[in-house]
A protein has these predicted regions:
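Catalytic core and acceptor-binding pocket of nucleotide-sugar-dependent glycosyltransferases
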Residues: 137-209
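GT-A fold catalytic core of metal-dependent nucleotide-sugar glycosyltransferases
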Residues: 71-118
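Short His-Asn-centered micro-motif
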Residues: 6-9, 38-41, 88-90, 110-111, ...
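Active-site regions of enzymes building and remodeling cell-envelope glycoconjugates
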Residues: 47-59, 102-110, 209
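PAPS-dependent sulfotransferase catalytic domain
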Residues: 101-157, 161, 181
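Short, polar loop motifs at secondary-structure junctions
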Residues: 36-45, 90-97, 199-201
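Conserved glycosyltransferase catalytic-site signature
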Residues: 65, 69, 90-92, 177-182
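N-terminal anchoring/stem segment of glycosyltransferases
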Residues: 1-67, 74-81, 153
Length: 209
């Protein structure tokens, strides 16, 4: 299968990209044809035929996180030619084999810091004026934003809807409480993914505990 890894590395986060790509080569869907789409505000040329660099304008935090899916939506034509697309935060460290269990329509990782908490305290967007709003009665699972993906058509549908919602919020002067993660959780609340356990996004702070 033809796989595209998407990551966004603005400012100092560019330092993490080489390690991420090395770990993907070593551990992630190793029997498949892996490519990368890198969004960055750093000046850089194409580094290999399997890595496409998409330049974005430098913006202050939290815009680079908030607008992840807006950036992705600008590369729809490129991404639609892949079988699967996965989005990683640039500073994710892959420490073990990730295999074909992630090759679903969409996958989402249950948030490691939230999975044992009561649903009533999950940090969904609670303001009704935001397009990321999730009502108390609809609270179910809470997902981490640092890794998600699936079949390209499903992923691109998600990117299109989330980017439109982020833009609508922006027009109304609203920033969702946890930025792209709030919008991701709204989308997964409506279109549930295949759940991956928190071990897929284990916090570095807990390593060794």
């Amino acid at each position: 299968m033809k796989i595209c890894i998407v990551t966004i590395a603005t400012g100092r986060y560019i330092q993490f990209v080489e390690k991420l790509l090395d770990k993907i080569t070593e551990h992630f869907l190793v029997d498949h044809d892996i490519h990368c789409l890198l969004f960055t505000d750093n000046d850089m040329d194409e580094v290999s035929e399997n890595i496409k660099v998409s330049q974005i304008e430098h913006k202050p935090w939290p815009e680079p996180a908030l607008k992840k899916y807006n950036y992705i939506n600008t590369e729809r034509e490129y991404l639609k030619d892949f079988d699967y697309v996965y989005l990683f935060d640039a500073d994710v460290d892959i420490v073990d084999t990730v295999g074909e269990e992630v090759m679903e329509d969409l996958v989402g990782v249950l948030h490691p810091w939230k999975v044992l908490e009561d649903k009533s305290v999950y940090p969904y967007e609670g303001r009704e004026k935001s397009t990321a709003y999730v009502s108390d009665s609809d609270r179910d699972r809470y997902y981490a934003a640092a890794f998600t993906g699936g079949k390209s058509k499903n992923f691109l549908k998600m990117a299109e809807i989330i980017s439109a919602r982020v833009s609508e919020d922006e027009e109304n002067g609203i920033i969702a409480v946890w930025h792209d993660e709030s919008h991701l959780n709204k989308y997964f609340n409506e279109y549930p993914p295949v759940d991956l356990p928190p071990s897929y996004m284990f916090p570095e702070e807990l390593m060794g505990n």
